Amino acid sequence: RHLAKVEVASSSLVIRSIPFPHRLFALMRFFVFGGDFLNELLSLVRKAVDKYRMIEEGDCIAVGVSGGKDSLCLLAALGELKRFYPKKFTLKAIMVDPCFFGNPTDYSEITELCRRLYIEPVIKTTQLYEIIFQVRKESNPCSMCARMRRGILHDAARAAGCNKIALGHNTDDAVETFFMNLLQGGKIGCFQPVTYLSRKDITMIRPLIYVSERQTENLSKKLNLPIIKSPCPADGNTAREQAKLFAKDLDKTYGKVYEKIIGALERRRIDGWTDEDPSKLRRKSKPGT
């Protein structure tokens, strides 16, 4: 069996065949090493998946893999979940390479991880760094980069035959987004656990919404995941980083701030969040009820 590694440079498409041998024992060692950490992650991921009905029978899900701890934990969790989840689905790992400083990113260790998880890796090479930092010289590069990466990811997922995209946004990300919307935009809001994009005809899911950044950090170390440190010049100097520090300060003062804000989003049903249990949601979705 073979996997297709897809590289897109400008408008050209190059497909290279990658051997895909069975590596059952390597896969078993990978997950046994994670121990209770992986079980805890899987429990929280399944809670989100079940509650918001993120996965349906026959889904082909593109996992957006940046190379950070969150996206790699998501890749590992969904790779394990698909082995026993009652609804059968397939996974593809899509990496959008910005080519920082004109250099392609080395994804070899991540593609090896994909082989161990029986997931097809797809790499899309772009000129994002050149466009944003050298051509346009953006004063606010993060916003533009995020928009462009999303568009590229959406198109790559559709081209790969996927109907859903899984993103690695965790509990901390949700709380930081809440504060950014409140303090910068003067509105109460957050990203949605599940979002259907009608223009792209694709659904975004966020299975890590109940997983904290501390948990993904611990698990990524325990599993020795192949994290790629971001060489982005703007890394660590963003509005989100300020929101992160603000949330941490509040948590030190008041305690359980992250859980409280997630609970408030769900109780008030803000932006698709809900506090209803999955069984009630399913009953409501049945025709004639």
Give the label of every model feature segment.
Residues 13-15:
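Short linear/disordered segments characteristic of secreted peptide precursors
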